[in-house]
């Protein structure tokens, strides 16, 4: 861990615990800050808060009292999940206090260099691919960020010359100040998290923050097929490196003659890549570009792409039961992700399980993709909305159930041998489940109960 006196004796308020907030509080205390943590959950139910008290950290739980900010703080660190509309956060900003996320702390203490990956879809797959490619190359990369590994915890272990391959959400990037990845990857931008950011413009601006502090020595890996991404890329100071699944670029990562090319040279035939789906081709191209910039060999990249079959909850093959194939795509928390999942099974009979948190989206963009679906089983707050679009798409078999667990046997009853039964909700999970991982695990367990 890089020695720093920046936080010594500073008064820091950490708003929101969970994994990232608790990790930030522990780190700040270790760096000599005077830390106060504030969390909505009552202390009696708050194991994370109880574990912080013996470290000399003051704990204020059971709500977000605005008067807490009448005390003199130098800095606020907020859990990424807490929106900027939260009254505590708004008051902190009104008082002129810097408000950051733990990714900023990770950057301050890391002796290694960051590869940051963001986008509306494909972040986890791309992050994992880059990490695996560097590992296969004999490097010693670290995996961090929104992938479930708190960045400021991982950054403590980073050594000079070591890469931190870090998945970054818009929530995290909205709260950075000095954070500067040596390689920044922007995959795509679509309507997502509008309940959090308010507008698509604010959401895109948060994503664009990944490039904000880069210099001419750094790299911006950007999707040449996404107009909004390219618009953002037009103003970056770093060296632009393009990837494209549709354009013959000549430089960067692209497809030509059935193979992936890097700067004019073939790397791997697409036929030799295990990971399914056209959307994953974009993720692979981005990963190839980032891995090559980080020094990976073609052989290491080929080795990974010839064996890597995907990440859990992302078009994950679960089982085949009585001729029906089950896929878990619980990570499909927005409409585009479900469009891509359905595209991956074009021409096959699909029974779709969908629904979840209502963020105000309409689902008309699903209509052309639903026309290939033979039946839908719907749950959650958006069930009626998606059901109306399914009717417009001409789907005759529409079922409504309470939750994912009940959806699985209903889908099985509706299915025939040769069918694909696909969980791809097109919505976040938080109306019924804590995380998309929990939702996916419940789906997997329900599938195995059919055996």
From Swiss-Prot:
Binding residues annotated for ATP, in chain numbering: 119-125
SUPFAM superfamilies (UniProt xref): MurCD N-terminal domain (SSF51984), MurD-like peptide ligases, catalytic domain (SSF53623), MurD-like peptide ligases, peptide-binding domain (SSF53244)
Location(s), subcellular: Cytoplasm
Gene3D superfamilies: Mur ligase, C-terminal domain, Mur-like, catalytic domain, NAD(P)-binding Rossmann-like Domain
GO MF annotation terms: ATP binding; UDP-N-acetylmuramoylalanine-D-glutamate ligase activity
UniProt signal peptide: none
GO annotation, biological process: cell division; cell wall organization; peptidoglycan biosynthetic process; regulation of cell shape
Annotated catalysed reactions: UDP-N-acetyl-alpha-D-muramoyl-L-alanine + D-glutamate + ATP = UDP-N-acetyl-alpha-D-muramoyl-L-alanyl-D-glutamate + ADP + phosphate + H(+)
NCBIfam families on file: murD
Task of the protein: Cell wall formation. Catalyzes the addition of glutamate to the nucleotide precursor UDP-N-acetylmuramoyl-L-alanine (UMA).
Stated family: Belongs to the MurCDEF family.
Designated name of the protein: UDP-N-acetylmuramoylalanine--D-glutamate ligase
Organism taxonomic ancestry: Bacteria, Bacillati, Bacillota, Bacilli, Bacillales
Record gene name: murD
């Amino acid at each position: 861990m890089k020695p720093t006196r920046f936080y010594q004796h500073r008064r820091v308020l950490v708003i929101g615990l969970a994994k990232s907030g608790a990790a930030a509080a522990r780190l700040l205390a270790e760096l000599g800050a005077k830390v106060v943590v504030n969390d909505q959950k009552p202390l009696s139910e708050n194991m994370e808060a109880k574990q912080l008290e013996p470290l000399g950290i003051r704990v204020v739980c059971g709500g977000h009292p605005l008067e807490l900010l009448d005390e003199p703080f130098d800095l606020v660190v907020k859990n990424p999940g807490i929106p900027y509309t939260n009254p505590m956060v708004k008051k902190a900003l009104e008082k002129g206090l810097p408000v950051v996320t733990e990714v900023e702390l990770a950057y301050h203490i890391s002796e290694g260099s960051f590869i940051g990956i963001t986008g509306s879809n494909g972040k986890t797959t791309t992050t994992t691919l880059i990490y695996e490619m560097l590992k296969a190359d004999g490097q010693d990369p670290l995996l961090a960020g929104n992938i479930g590994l708190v960045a400021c915890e991982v950054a403590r272990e980073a050594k000079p010359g070591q890469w931190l391959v870090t998945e970054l959400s818009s929530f995290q990037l909205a709260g950075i100040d000095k954070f500067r990845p040596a390689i920044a990857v922007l995959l795509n931008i679509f309507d997502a998290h509008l309940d959090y950011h308010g507008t698509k413009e604010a959401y895109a601006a948060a994503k664009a923050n990944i490039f904000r502090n880069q210099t001419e020595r750094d790299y911006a890996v950007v999707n040449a097929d996404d107009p909004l991404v390219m618009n953002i890329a037009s103003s970056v100071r770093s060296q632009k490196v393009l990837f494209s699944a549709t354009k013959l670029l000549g430089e960067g990562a692209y497809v030509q003659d059935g193979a992936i090319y890097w700067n004019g040279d073939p790397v791997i035939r697409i036929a030799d890549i295990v990971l399914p789906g056209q959307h994953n081709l974009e993720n692979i191209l981005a990963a190839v570009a980032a891995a090559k910039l980080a020094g990976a060999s073609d052989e290491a990249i080929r080795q990974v792409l010839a064996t890597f079959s995907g990440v859990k909850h992302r078009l994950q093959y679960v089982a085949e039961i009585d001729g029906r194939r089950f896929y878990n795509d619980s990570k499909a928390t927005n409409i585009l992700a479900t469009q891509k999942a359905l595209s991956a099974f074009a021409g096959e009979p699909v029974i779709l399980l969908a629904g979840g948190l209502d963020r105000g989206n309409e689902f008309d963009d699903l209509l052309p993709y639903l026309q290939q679906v033979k039946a839908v089983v719907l749950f959650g707050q958006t069930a009626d909305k998606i059901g109306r679009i399914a009717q417009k798409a001409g789907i005759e078999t529409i079922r409504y159930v309470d939750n994912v667990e009940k959806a699985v046997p209903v889908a099985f009853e509706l299915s025939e041998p040769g069918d694909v039964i696909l969980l791809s909700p097109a919505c976040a999970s938080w109306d019924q489940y804590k995380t998309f991982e929990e939702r996916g695990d419940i789906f997997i367990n329900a599938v195995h109960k059919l055996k």
